[in-house]
Curated annotation (Swiss-Prot):
It comes from Macrococcus caseolyticus (strain JCSC5402). Keywords: Cell cycle, Cell division, DNA-binding. Gene3D superfamilies: Homing endonucleases (3.10.28.10). This is Probable cell division protein WhiA. The keyword DNA-binding applies. One of its GO terms (molecular function) is DNA binding. One of its GO terms (biological process) is regulation of sporulation. Belongs to the WhiA family.
Length: 316
């Protein structure tokens, strides 16, 4: 079972008060429901590929409105051929749609009615219902961090985004081919969202994976940094040795001033040690890393002049 499916199964087991149940059911029916006419009466069909979500719709509708509901199972004929679960509501359909602010004055409402989310707990419940109906979240173990909720209507998606940002989640709205999404890309904000909608077990798993991933990434960055520094050090040492050998071939190392001559010989003899270690080997006393670097730069300048055929004056 995917991380998103496990999370949704957890969310469907949350106990809620009547006002919160209404808010959650409103999101579920608005986003997963459709209205048909059968035998001269309205019928609401709420469809999901997740059996736990279908049971949630059934139990919330029964709890709030006390009506009988048909549960149907269909087999998808395309792609994975998953089961499709349908909650069919034939009784009190107009009352239900009116009560959940999906239908007002005979017109379908595309935005989120504020009467549903007056209380803080109801806002969280509406977001939970919206995620159950149209939400997805990447597996934190294998993918980049991403959580989204799909809406058919722009005004509804913007309402979700605004509600999420009421909790400081930095959510964004984006148009997709067949609708709109409200999405989060930051791991910390996804964790906050899971907490807001009551997905505490999913939150713990997400945080565990996130900690391991962040630690692994930190180690990789450190290794890469150390490797880059090592390669830089090796490259500099090879260049220095090459320049010293050029000087030796052209004019002889013995022609260098004493302070450069000793460093040149030490570098050729100890090509794999650091500048700090070179400075500790000088016979006249320890010199600093910057002091060693200054002398090696002087040697580099002399070698470059020799390559260019320039005149060199060496002070003993």
């Amino acid at each position: 079972m995917s991380f998103a499916s496990e999370m949704k199964n957890e969310l469907t087991r949350i106990e809620t008060d009547l006002c919160c149940s209404k808010a959650e059911l409103a999101a579920l029916i608005r986003m997963n429901g459709n209205l048909n006419i059968q035998n001269m009466q309205w019928v609401i069909n709420v469809q999901s590929e997740n059996a736990a979500i279908a049971r949630r719709v059934y139990s919330l509708t029964k709890k709030i409105f006390g009506v009988d509901i048909e549960l149907l199972v269909r087999k998808k004929m395309k792609l994975k051929k998953n089961n499709v679960y349908i909650c069919r509501i034939k009784m009190k359909t107009k009352e239900i749609l009116d009560e959940l602010s999906i239908l007002q004055d005979g017109q379908f409402v595309q935005h989120i009615d504020q009467s549903l989310i007056k209380e803080e707990c109801c806002k969280r419940s509406y977001l939970r219902g919206a995620f159950l109906a149209g939400g997805s979240v990447n597996n934190p173990e294998t993918s980049s961090y991403h959580l989204e909720i799909f809406s058919l209507y722009e005004s509804h998606s913007e309402g979700l985004t605004e509600m999420m940002n009421g909790y400081g989640l930095n959510a964004k709205t984006l148009e997709r081919k067949k609708g709109y999404i409200s999405y989060l890309k930051e791991a910390e904000k996804i964790s906050d969202f899971l907490s807001i909608i009551g997905g505490y077990q999913a939150l713990l798993k997400f945080e565990d994976v996130r900690i391991v991933r962040d630690m692994r990434n930190s180690v990789n960055r450190l290794v890469n940094c150390e490797t880059a520094n090592l390669n830089k050090t090796i490259g500099a040492a090879m260049r220095q040795v090459e320049n010293i050998r050029l000087i030796d071939e052209e004019i002889g190392i013995d022609e260098l001033p004493e302070r450069l001559r000793e460093i040149a010989r030490l570098r050729v003899q100890h090509q794999d040690i650091s500048l700090k270690e070179l400075g500790e080997m000088v016979s006249t006393g320890v010199i600093s890393k910057s002091g060693v670097n200054h002398r090696l730069r002087k040697i580099d300048e002399i070698a470059e002049k020799l390559r260019n055929g320039e005149h060199i004056e060496l002070k003993k």
